[in-house]
Regions:
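Sec-dependent signal peptide recognition
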Residues: 2-8
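Acidic/histidine-rich, surface-exposed loop or edge segments in extracytoplasmic proteins
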Residues: 25-35
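Short, gly/Ser/Thr-rich active-site loops of penicillin-recognizing serine hydrolases
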Residues: 19, 317, 321, 331, ...
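C-terminal motif of bacterial Sec signal peptides marking the signal peptidase cleavage site
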Residues: 15-16
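Short, conserved catalytic-motif segment at the N-terminal edge
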Residues: 35-98, 118-120, 137-142, 284-286, ...
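Active-site SXXK
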Residues: 51, 71, 96-129, 133-134, ...
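Structured C-terminal helix/loop/strand segments within mature extracytoplasmic catalytic/sensor domains
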Residues: 374-420
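Short, surface-exposed loop or secondary-structure junction motifs
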Residues: 135-368
Length: 420
């Protein structure tokens, strides 16, 4: 369990072990030649070929890639189509559904409230959402008839558990135990066009049986949607209003929304579905149609490559952009350190607050300290503090059979472009 004192002790220790970023953050996104920031132009140009390979292979319709070093953009291009059927060319300022790349933004909102002393990561969630008191855990599950039994959880779910995806909440993966059980409750995961409030849906989350006791296992899922409701309760603002006032506006993220204004509808890219996908199950027009009243802290935002770069670069700079601070430097340091203790994701890769973090060097040229996250619609970003690199790749596609090859290959190209 992480108290405020423990949190800042860890953060302070981390800061002593790494170079401190200055507060002279980026004044507007400056675009430079790759060589000016120690990157090899010919190597970065392979990004274009890599994205084109994915387009030619029918995996995606197009992509916008952005690579920056030292806060300066060295490669920024759109390749392919925003609508492949209509053959509309993709533009750099087109808007993408970013799904789970919403999670780091909602986590940032939580940590702002933490800094203000309005909540603590060790607090039980029931302090803010009473329905989370006396949580139950699945004890047994009968695959034959989908019946299950429960028992009391070993302890209360905390804010820390939600931040680290160790709460026991998950997603209803098709055919899984969670998928079968969750279907009995009618819970909304991600986005919806229905007239539903976050507060009401989170009450259903609170009734769901946990898949395991809090804190004993990393189980990716809807924890950050619950955190979105905590933001609302603590701040007294709807989640969209809080994020706009305290994150998007200070960072001048002018094209990031839960629901797009009408004048920007034409900039939302079309989702490319491969032959194995069923578009009807995804309701991908949620950003421009429906009730527009559900603010999913774990999956609901839409953004551009440039906007998200502003957010990611502010993190790399220690929580600041243009002398506007959204987080303390020590808070960012702790958020991007491992918080899983003895739990383990994979060799070198662990989880902080809102990000996967590398505690050792990894494949594809990844360095210790790298942190990142991606989204359901095939988007990804990462920050490499050891090289001062921020990179993003935005696409919107589903059932892409080689999405790992797309993203990993992109990262390898970026890392190989660094002049040693």
């Amino acid at each position: 369990m992480f108290s405020r004192l423990t949190f800042f002790f860890i953060a302070g220790t981390l800061l002593c072990c790494q170079l401190s970023k200055t507060e002279n953050a980026l004044t507007g996104p400056e675009i430079v030649s790759p060589g000016e920031v120690g990157l090899i132009a010919d190597s970065l140009d392979l990004i274009r070929d890599h994205i084109q390979w994915a387009i030619d292979s029918q995996y995606i319709a197009g992509g916008v890639a952005l690579v920056a070093r030292d806060g300066k953009i060295a490669w920024y291009e759109a390749v392919g189509f925003s609508d492949r059927v209509k053959q509309d060319s993709l533009r750099k300022d087109d808007i993408f559904r970013i799904a789970s790349m919403t999670k780091p933004i909602t986590t940032t909102a939580i940590m702002q409230l933490f800094e203000q002393g309005k909540l603590d990561t060790s607090d039980p969630v029931s302090k803010y959402i009473p329905e989370f008191a006396n949580s139950l855990v699945v004890d047994s599950f009968n695959e034959a008839d989908s019946s299950y039994t429960t028992r009391p959880a070993s302890r209360a779910v905390t804010i820390h558990d939600l931040l680290t995806h160790t709460s026991g909440l998950t997603y209803s993966y098709p055919g899984s135990k969670s998928g079968i059980i969750y279907s009995k409750f009618g819970v909304i995961e991600g986005w919806t066009k229905d007239s539903v409030l976050l507060a009401d849906n989170v009450r259903i989350f609170a009734r769901l049986p946990l898949m395991h006791d809090p804190g004993v296992q990393f189980t990716y899922g809807t924890s950050v949607d619950v955190l979105g409701r905590v933001v609302e309760v603590v701040s007294g603002q709807p989640l969209d209003a809080y994020i706009e006032e305290h994150i998007l506006s200070p960072l001048e993220m002018v094209d990031t929304y839960f629901y797009l204004p009408a004048e920007k509808y034409d900039r939302l890219v079309d989702v490319w579905y491969t032959a194995d996908a069923n578009p009807e199950v995804y309701h991908d027009d949620y950003a421009v149609s429906g009730a527009k009243m559900y603010f999913a802290g774990g999956a609901g935002l839409n953004s551009t490559a440039m906007d998200y770069f502003k957010f990611a670069n502010a993190l790399m700079m220690g929580g600041i952009r243009d002398n506007t601070r959204i987080l303390k430097e020590e808070t960012v340091a702790s958020m991007t350190s491992n918080h899983l203790d003895t739990l383990h994701l994979s060799d070198g890769e662990q989880f902080g607050y809102g990000f996967s973090v590398y505690t050792a060097d990894g494949s594809f040229g990844r360095k210790m300290g790298r942190y990142s996250w991606g989204g359901f619609w095939q988007t990804i970003f990462w920050v490499d503090p050891s090289r001062n690199i921020v990179a993003l790749l935005m696409t919107n596609a589903r059932e892409t059979p080689k999405w790992n090859e797309l993203f990993d290959g992109y990262e390898r190209i970026v890392n190989q472009s660094v002049k040693e």
